[in-house]
Amino acid sequence: MVTWKMINLGQVSRNQFWGEPDDVVRRPGICNGVVLFDTEQVILVDPPYSNEEMLRCLDAHAGLKPKDIDVVYITHAHSDHFDGIHYFPAARWCTGMEERDILGEMLDARKLDGNKLEGLREKLTPNIQVVPLPGHTMGSTGLLFDGPEGKVLVAGDSVMTREFFEHQKGYFKSESQ
């Protein structure tokens, strides 16, 4: 069984269903960061912050330091989902196979080693399944596992807000990717 903890709450940069135009940033876009505890591995999903806030959230909400993270998993190639990856150079870096090339190029552009990134199709660990969730980006993925409360899906930005789900509308960036 896999247990998990949220380390921060994200926010969308704009929401057309609240009357906010897609071409005006209202607030910084930040994803939810999640830590999974799977037998011998600690997995950080979508490290959201490029600054020391990443370290503070990890410690305050999960009691962890960068050296404690075995795997960093990125759900899709939007920068708010990998801004903090540089804090985890010793960890294994993974994403879904469909995002691997573009995300690798984005890491290279930040002077990080994009070749280190592994593209996965089915399993991250024997207990954690990689699930394709195309929509927000065509290569978006989530992680599905059995938790204490039943089945859990860490889904990145698959559903931005209830309004996006109800209207079956993608985020403004999605249409070009």
Where are these regions (language model features)?
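Beta-strand-turn-beta hairpins that frame and shape the catalytic cleft
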Residues: 1-4, 37-42, 121-131, 147-151
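Short acidic loop-to-beta-strand element that houses the catalytic metal-binding Asp/Glu
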Residues: 33-35, 123, 140-144
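Active-site neighborhood of phospho(di)ester-bond hydrolases with catalytic His/Asp-centered motifs
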Residues: 44-48, 70-80, 94-96, 132-135, ...
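Metallo-beta-lactamase
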Residues: 64, 68, 87, 91-177, ...
